Amino acid sequence: VLEENGKLWNAAACLCEDGSRHYYRKSHLTEREAQWAEAGDCAGLVLDRPYGRTGVLLGNEIFITEVPRLLANRGCDILAVPAVENPSCPPGIPEVQQEVEHYHLARVRANENSTYAAFAAQKGVSGIFGPDMFLVPRNEVVLNESGFADMTMDTRFIFSDESGCPVINLVREKPMLGTRHTTWYDK
C-alpha cells in the first residue's frame, strides 16, 4: 500500500541498483480493492534496466490480456508480476486436468507477447517463464512452494545458436506483435 496526499494505492515498489525507487500504482482494481484504493495510471511502469526493459503489472492484471500486451508494445523484454492470489486460472473458469503449470497465465502471457514473465504468487505456482511455450525443454523455472527462482534471461538482440549462426532473439524481435491490429487499443 502506498499513501500519497491522503490517497491510498495498491502499489508495487521497484528498487533499482542505483538506489532509485519507482512505484507502479495498480490501474485495474478488483471490487474489494476499489473500496479503499485509487486506480493508477493505465500506461503502466516501464523501466530500462541493464538486463532488459521491464514492465510491471500487479496482481489480477495478468488476467487482462491487454495489460501485458501494452507493455510488450512499449518494448518490454520482461513482465514483472508480483502478488497474485490464484495465478493458475481467472475466477469463474474451471481448472483443467493438465499439469498445473500448463495453462499458467504467466506462461501464456509470456508466450503471447514474446517476453519473459517473472511471477510471484501468494499461493500456488510461482516462477520465471520464457517467451517460447514450444521449446523443449521449456526455458523456465517453476516453484510450487516457497523459495527463490533464479534464471538467466537472454535479452540480447542477436546471439549465436549451436552452429554459430546469428539468430535474432525472440524477445527482441517480438514476432507476435506484428500480427496484431493495434488500431483496437492504441490511444
Positions of the model-derived regions?
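Catalytic-core segment of enzymes that process non-peptidic bonds
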Residues: 1-56, 111-148
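RNA-binding accessory domains that recognize and position tRNA/RNA substrates
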Residues: 48, 74, 186
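CN hydrolase (nitrilase-like) catalytic-core segments centered on the catalytic cysteine
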Residues: 63-148
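Active-site mouth loops of central-metabolism enzymes
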Residues: 56-62
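Generic recognition of cysteine residues
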Residues: 14-16, 42, 76, 89, ...
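Active-site-proximal loop/turn and secondary-structure-junction residues that shape catalytic pockets
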Residues: 28-30, 60, 84-86
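A short, polar/proline- and glycine-enriched secondary-structure boundary/capping micro-motif
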Residues: 33-36, 66-68, 172-173
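C-terminal beta-strand edge segments of enzyme domains
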Residues: 118-187
